Amino acid sequence: MLYHTIIRKRYDHIMNENDIWLIAGLGNPEAKYDGTRHNAGFAALDALADKWNISVGKTKFQGLWGQGEVDGHKVVLLKPLTYMNLSGDSIAPMAGFFKIPADHVLVLCDDITQAPGKLRIRPSGSAGGHNGLKSIIARLGGENFPRIRIGIGAKPHPDYDLAAWVLGKFPPEDAKAIADRYPDLEAAAKLIMDGKLSLAQSKYNG
């Protein structure tokens, strides 16, 4: 019995060597963008890196990255430094380098259609007007990659300039609403890596 247990553990280890995920948080580099709505993906990735004790400090393919293991999954964390609209120029070559298929590329980004702190988990889909997602879709060659969109709140009125809104800083109450959801975001990311995206949706969407 012990022999079979050892063999099974070795087999599981071999299988897990091919289980690798790229998790990318979207945002803009430069300190002046810290704390802005459009950098919600960067902030969420930093929260995961802290929780998982993964240092995101190496540079490759126009991005800051680090790697580790989370619940048996190999994980590469990435913050593209290309600016938002060219996020795919960092994500696609990083995925290619590690031979990570698109359905194992999990993207964290902001969502102006959701209230601050709301999460929207999707297995695939269009860019929905998000230029970062648009770039990733173009560079990966399709829409079939999961994403967790983080609510940042809608413009206060239709005439408000969109760029000014997403590049504006969060008020403290909105920043807290988002930070309070980081435990849910982490749990959702783990479920997605476990192949349980539908469960992540039912538990954490909204």
Predicted feature locations:
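Hydrophobic alpha-helical segments within soluble ligand-binding/sensing domains
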Residues: G128-G132
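Nucleotide and nucleotide-moiety/phosphate-recognizing core
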Residues: L2-S124, K134-I148, K155-D161, G168, ...
